[in-house]
Amino acid sequence: MSKTVVRKNESLDDALRRFKRTVSKSGTLQEYRKREFYEKPSVKRKLKSEAARKRKNKKRF
């Protein structure tokens, strides 16, 4: 869980920007979206192989 304390004389926009940065760096939102719905193991394997294929093609060019 990301925690951000608003500093003295800091605007709310700046604090929100810092919070968003910490959340994105920790990968919390990405993990939530990944686990939002159940994926069958066969679907996980298929997505994993497709991602590997995309990385391989990207590396080749």
From Swiss-Prot:
PANTHER family: MITOCHONDRIAL 28S RIBOSOMAL PROTEIN S21, SMALL RIBOSOMAL SUBUNIT PROTEIN BS21. This is Small ribosomal subunit protein bS21. Belongs to the bacterial ribosomal protein bS21 family. GO terms for molecular function: structural constituent of ribosome. The keyword Ribonucleoprotein applies. One of its GO terms (biological process) is translation. Keywords: Ribonucleoprotein, Ribosomal protein. Gene3D superfamilies: Ribosomal protein S8.
